[in-house]
């Protein structure tokens, strides 16, 4: 499990990359994570602009304008990856468990922006 300073580094890095960016599409591959993802999750995020990425304890919070938000907890083995849309290279691996090739079956959520996407990957 990442410690608090590691989560803060992920927050800072994520904030630099996605602040003021608009979500084009959300892909949910697994709704049954620690907390079941709500049915309206995609609708709440798609076509919304990120205002900032904040943190409460070890929870990452992607804040959107007009009050919507997305809460992420990395758990024991979760990672966040920023991947260019052509999938040929990673912009940033916001993980301390570097894995260049993500097993697709563990890519639970993708948040797609204009030229890149965020992938939440967790083998647990």
Which positions does each model-derived feature cover?
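Structured catalytic/nucleic-acid-binding cores of DNA maintenance enzymes
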Residues: 1-124
């Amino acid at each position: 499990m990442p410690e608090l300073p590691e989560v803060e580094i992920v927050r800072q890095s994520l904030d630099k990359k996605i602040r003021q960016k608009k979500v084009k599409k959300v892909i949910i591959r697994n709704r049954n994570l620690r907390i079941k993802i709500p049915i309206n999750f995609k609708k709440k995020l798609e076509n919304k602009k990120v205002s900032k990425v904040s943190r409460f304890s070890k929870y990452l919070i992607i804040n959107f304008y007009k009050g919507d938000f997305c809460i992420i907890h990395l758990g024991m083995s979760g990672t966040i990856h920023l991947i260019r849309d052509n999938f040929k290279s990673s912009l940033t691996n916001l993980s301390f468990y570097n894995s260049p090739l993500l097993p697709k079956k563990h890519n639970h959520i993708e948040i797609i922006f204009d030229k890149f996407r965020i992938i939440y990957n967790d083998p647990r």
